[in-house]
């Protein structure tokens, strides 16, 4: 939606709109570090009543960051560059599309 939940980016105004929130099927939070992930997840949950289906971004650049997010926030965390397929699978599952399309093997 934008470049930040806070500030002049307008994401907060979008998420404040109940009609838009009700149309969301999945939200992936990208965070720079575990503290930003914590704050982003907290804002999404408490202010906007949105449960993120995953966290990605530089906060997931190492196993420690991934573990902190998963354990402290109880949200799946994946590095999109090194574990993109798992992130995709997580989102597909979260939005209810798992098993609805045939899996095509790569050539």
Where are these regions (language model features)?
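C-terminal helix of von Willebrand factor
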Residues: 83-103
